[in-house]
Amino acid sequence: DGDKPETEESLETEEESTGTLSENDEDTELVPEQNTMEDTQDEIQLEDGAENVTEGENTTGELSDNAEEETFTSEEADRFSDGSAPEGELGTYQTVTLEIEDGQDITAPLNTLFLQLKEQASDETPCKIIIPPGNYKLTGTLCMYSNMYLYAKGATITKTSPTKHLILRLGNTKESEGEYEGYRNVIIDGGTWDFNYQCVAEKDEPGGFVGFCIGHATNVTIKNATFLNNLKSHFLEFGGVKNAKITGCTFHGYYKNYVKGGQECIQIDCCTDEDNVFPQYMPYDGSTCEDFVIDGNVFEDVFAGVGTHSMMAGKTYKRITVTNNTFHNVKKRCIEFLNYEDSTAENNTCLLYTSPSPRDRSVS
């Protein structure tokens, strides 16, 4: 989303509404129940190769018979618990390192490893997949599954394909269980993820592409990662997600020839295909997002920071906490809460200009 033409406002006008929603905000309008309000969604499609990865595909990413078992901490156990384990009980997870050469295309090897681990990964024994430090190409969509921990510290993954496609999603099909039951217990830790809009052949044609698109899920963590060079859309987009944490991440860079729409780095959304709002996950049951912690991130030289510019009549986004983040040189707005309930934005620092200014201030 974020592709609907709108009147460009001055930075001074936008800064006055940072972190708040005006009743007369031109991005929104009231709609009947079960309808949505949204800027037109970018036309985003999974590449066929990413959506149809099969079990038998050849790859260098192999699961060893002697995959290392590790004990995870009580904190990690809580993150992976489905609530059925006795309190304080620790579990184990298998750690598997992706076999890949520096400079290789990571798409097929990692997707095949995800599929190999899909049935094996459980609430009791989740799987940790390590991407070795190095530089890798990405030419399609990565499809991750429940009970997986993707560790990418020291790895740089750069999109090199000329088409517009998701960088990462849960599952390799749009169909899943509804509400928050589709996927669970997913952690993405580290890595530099370069969306590299420069490589896209038709940047100025309608639509951009979302980076990580997460829907119908519970217990999702994205931490310590760097996201670069967004094209007319979102680095991270969530729809119908409960219990999510985005911490310690950096977001930088966008296509500056395009200055319309939302383009939030972190978009909090609802599951509906009305106006192409969030079409990547079925069913379109109107599930919103609840219990988010967005803390300690840096947003630098981006179009918009965090928030929501679509909603379903009669439904709210609940318990969204945006704290201790730094926003520097944001074109449109840092934070937008739309139809939020029991939510907080505090102790965020907004540096409104590239050089020190009396207008630089903290938002509490």
Residue ranges, per PLM feature:
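Intrinsically disordered, low-complexity repeat and linker tracts
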Residues: 1-84
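Right-handed parallel beta-helix/beta-solenoid
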Residues: 69-111
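N-terminal extracellular ligand-recognition/capping segment immediately after the signal peptide
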Residues: 101-111, 125-165, 171-173, 193, ...
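Parallel beta-helix/beta-solenoid
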Residues: 145-147, 152, 183, 188, ...
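Residues in short coils/turns that link rungs of repeat/solenoid architectures in beta-rich domains
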Residues: 159, 195, 200, 229-230, ...
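Structural detector of coil-to-beta-strand junctions
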Residues: 164-167, 209-211, 233-235, 257-258, ...
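Conserved small/polar residues in nucleotide/adenosyl-binding loops
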Residues: 353-360
